[in-house]
Regions:
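A short acidic, amphipathic alpha-helical/loop segment
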Residues: 88-92
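Gly/Ser/Thr-rich loops at beta-strand to alpha-helix junctions
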Residues: 9-12, 81-87, 107
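Short, flexible loop segments at boundaries between secondary-structure elements
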Residues: 100-119
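Hydrophobic alpha-helical segments
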Residues: 71-75, 85, 95, 99
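Short, surface-exposed amphipathic charged segments that create phosphate/polyanion-binding patches used
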Residues: 1-4, 19-21, 45-48, 114-119
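Periplasmic-binding protein-like
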Residues: 4, 75-83
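Short hydrophobic/aromatic-enriched beta-strand-loop microsegments
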Residues: 2-7, 93-106
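Active-site rim beta-loop-alpha module in soluble metabolic enzymes
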Residues: 13-72
Length: 119
């Protein structure tokens, strides 16, 4: 299985970037960007948002992952690189059937390790 890494801009996650952090982008990594999302660019990338239409942003985020899934049917998980995207994790899972990892999930996982729940 491969991992779909979703970023604000696909240009920011180049092969050189991945190589610098020890990841071979040609081995089980698919990069999806929100470069063409008008709602994302307006709200998050310095555009002049008139309103914050989170439904539009959610739809664009899910669409980018569905497109990546179509291009690479071996995707088995999604990693949200952008800190704006975790609110859409459930929508992504509901639409794709894939588990979603993001910085909030990482914090919760580490918190559970430090403060385990008694069962």
């Amino acid at each position: 299985k491969s991992v779909a890494v979703v970023a604000a801009s696909i240009k920011l996650l180049s092969a050189e970037f991945f190589s610098a952090v020890g990841v071979d982008i040609n081995h089980r990594v698919t990069v999806a960007g929100l470069d063409s999302s008008a709602s994302f660019n307006s709200m998050c990338m310095g555009g002049k948002a008139v309103s914050y239409e989170t439904d539009d942003l959610r739809d664009d985020v899910v669409a980018s992952i569905l497109a990546a899934q179509k291009d690479d049917p071996k995707i088995g998980a999604v990693l949200l690189e952008c800190t704006t995207l975790p609110p859409f994790a459930k929508d992504i899972t509901d639409q794709t059937g894939l588990p979603v990892f993001d910085f909030i999930a990482c914090i919760e996982w580490m918190h559970r390790a430090i403060h385990p729940k008694r069962y």
